[in-house]
Amino acid sequence: MTSLLRHLARPRGGGVLALASVLLLTGCAGDYVARTRGVRVSYQSEDYPGALVGLDAVSKEGSEKDALLVLLDKGMVLHAAGEWAESNKVMEEAEQLSARLDGVSVSEEAGALVTNERQRAYRGEDFEKLMISVVQALNYAELGDDEAAMVEVRQVNERLQKMVTEEKKPYQQLAIARYLGGVIREDQRDWDSAYIDYAKAYELEPRLGALVEPLLRLSKYTGRDDVYTALKEKYPEVAHPPLARDESQVVVVVEAGLSPEKQPTSRDYGTGGNLIEVPVYRDRGSAPSVRVQLGDQDERAVTVTSLADVARLHLDTRIGGMLAKQLASVAVKAGLAAGLGAATKSEELGVLAFLLLNAGNAPDLRSWLSLPAEFQVARFRVPAGSHTVRVEAGGRVSEHTVDVKPGRVGLVVVRRY
């Protein structure tokens, strides 16, 4: 090590300085997370027009490699603003771009071995691709288009099934997608399908509390006597009489908190104490506790899916592949540096070139940061007609009007930070 430091301390030529400059610029340029910090401040302050202006500016000055993230964030801002149709247009564009990016570019992969993962076009984590359809389903449900919403729900479930069975990934289906499927099917009076979706959501997240009400009611209605008896014994406090002819339901979906953010951490890849940096998800605070009031009913929203937990699971499945790529990258850079040293007949220059090349070997910390940490749900049985829903979270209170017809299920989607 002392010998190496002496080599590095010697004066170098302009070529080395030029190489250093290029590598440093490559490592630092185009940090999407940093460039959109102001956008996130506006978004979390519910200044949605300001967030959209900021995203447009980032899009104009930014790189194509961040194009998917711009679309995802824009679609989510429009969704939070209640611009359901506009959000779906952007999300559809994001879905199409994501599909195109899934075709791996050989030149891009090779380039990442010399520079770093941040120089590739962002393709999205597996769960982020699934969330495109979840957001679209909620948009369609708010627009009253149950069939289009169910298409998106089925797409989530089918994609997850493919990931598990064909790609051998240790994922589970998303409870929020199955629960939303139950809500939509119940609204369509497809009782058996609604029961199946509610039952699957309960299997994935057994801590649903009062949200098991439709599962109790529909298990009895569809003649699943053994299931009904077991549920009734477990939840004796949950009333579940049949719906009256003039009765309706309101389901409130609260997208709560901030999705976790990627941060670098070091992993040991061998017995020599050598460390490689990889990304891990770190929480950005806790999701707020949410209370929902409708008339004289007051419910605490129940967490159906922790997206923070899903994100960590999905990223953890990629760590092995990341380490392998990093090792391959180190090997390629060592070869390039050795070649440079041989060509210039300077061992010192080769060593410095390797250090400079490897200094840019940073993990990709980009992610879809406008997503929530959790999906929380509250539901109510109410007379048909117009109702005001009051949502309280983190000291912020908002009111939302929903009009629901007899026998139907009204949906209210709210974003809270």
Role assignments for model-derived ranges:
Residues S63-A67, S98-E109, Q161-P170, Y202-A230:
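Boundary/linker segments of alpha-helical solenoid repeat arrays
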Residues D225-Y417:
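Short loop/turn and low-complexity linker motifs enriched in small/turn-promoting residues
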Residues L24-Y48, A57-E61:
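Bacterial Sec signal peptide processing site at the extreme N-terminus
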